[in-house]
Amino acid sequence: MAAIPMHHGLLLAAILFALGMIGILVRRNLIFILMSIEIMLNAAGLAFVVAGSHWTQADGQVMFIFILSVAAAEVSVGLALLLLLHRRFQTLDADAVSKMRG
């Protein structure tokens, strides 16, 4: 089985990270913003795995496990906050967050 070259894996990670960043900057729906953050975290994890496999080290896979645990915590807290925002303001628009200021 032929290995995927390192620059191909890093290019894919960079493209995924850019798509996540564009999703954060363009979309106003908080669920899509949360999904874009998840895409960015997975892109960073992919970069770690690709770099670790290039140097035949397990460090990249260990870092990916840490990234997955951080992503799981981020999703649970983020969805709980989104649920509270939706109950209070009846919208998931990011501009509604500015109404929380006193």
UniProtKB/Swiss-Prot annotation:
Lineage at the top is: Bacteria, Pseudomonadati, Pseudomonadota, Betaproteobacteria, Nitrosomonadales
Enzyme nomenclature, EC number: 7.1.1.-
| Keywords, alphabetical | Cell inner membrane, Cell membrane, Membrane, NAD, Quinone, Translocase, Transmembrane, Transmembrane helix, Transport, Ubiquinone
Q: Name one GO cellular component term.
A: NADH dehydrogenase complex
NCBIfam families (alphabetical):
PRK05715.1-1 (NF004319), PRK05715.1-2 (NF004320)
Write down the HAMAP family for this protein, in alphabetical order. NDH1_NuoK
Reply yes or no: does the keyword Transport apply.
yes
Q: Which GO terms describe its biological process?
A: ATP synthesis coupled electron transport
The membrane spanning regions, by residue number, are 6-26, 30-50, 64-84
Give the domain of life: Bacteria
Which family, according to UniProt? Belongs to the complex I subunit 4L family.
Q: Where does this protein come from, organism-wise? A: Nitrosospira multiformis (strain ATCC 25196 / NCIMB 11849 / C 71)
Subcellular location(s): the record lists: Cell inner membrane
The GO molecular function terms of this record are: NADH:ubiquinone reductase (non-electrogenic) activity; quinone binding
* Record's function text: NDH-1 shuttles electrons from NADH, via FMN and iron-sulfur (Fe-S) centers, to quinones in the respiratory chain. The immediate electron acceptor for the enzyme in this species is believed to be ubiquinone. Couples the redox reaction to proton translocation (for every two electrons transferred, four hydrogen ions are translocated across the cytoplasmic membrane), and thus conserves the redox energy in a proton gradient.
Reactions accelerated catalytically: a quinone + NADH + 5 H(+)(in) = a quinol + NAD(+) + 4 H(+)(out)
On whether Transmembrane helix is a keyword of this UniProt record, the answer is yes
Which Gene3D superfamilies does this UniProt record tie to the protein?
1.10.287.3510
Record-linked InterPro entries: NADH_UbQ_OxRdtase_chain4L/K, NUOK/Mnh_C1-like
- Membrane disposition: Multi-pass membrane protein
Give the record's subunit note: NDH-1 is composed of 14 different subunits. Subunits NuoA, H, J, K, L, M, N constitute the membrane sector of the complex.
Protein name, UniProt field = NADH-quinone oxidoreductase subunit K
- Report the Pfam families cross-referenced here: Oxidored_q2
